[in-house]
Amino acid sequence: MRAWICLAPLALAACSGTYEPTPLTDKQAAKMDKALAGLVPGDKVTCVNREPQTNFTVISGNTLLYKVSRKLIYKNELIGSCNGLARGDTMIVRTFGSQYCRGDITSSADLTIGIPTGNCALGDFIPYRQPAP
């Protein structure tokens, strides 16, 4: 009986899956390349300030760009996938405080019919900046 109790966590771990993001299509990759052209990636950060008048740009159901200025754009790979975002659904982010942080719950919804279409969480933010002259 003890052997079964010891093996139960291993059996449950074997059932868990890993998340593989959907690769970008050629059109999505071109959109991201155009937005990040001339910018250099930096080290990942877990939180960024919410800036007024800035928006997330949806690249795919699991990739977002957060434009702070022409000189600074953050790339975010979602944890999970909000598939509806790629179709143009509305993104809803639940934040706690004045920052967007890794793990903040994000969902997508089709507001024309009032149905949620996906749930995911924000991942790490990778800053892309203009290189120093």
Q: Which role does the model predict for each range below?
A:
Residues 5-9:
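Sec-dependent signal peptide hydrophobic core
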Residues 1-3:
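Positively charged n-region of N-terminal signal peptides that target proteins for export
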Residues 12-14:
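C-terminal motif of bacterial Sec signal peptides marking the signal peptidase cleavage site
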Residues 16-75, 133:
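N-terminal secretory signal peptides
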Residues 79-133:
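Helix-rich interaction surfaces within compact, conserved domain-sized segments
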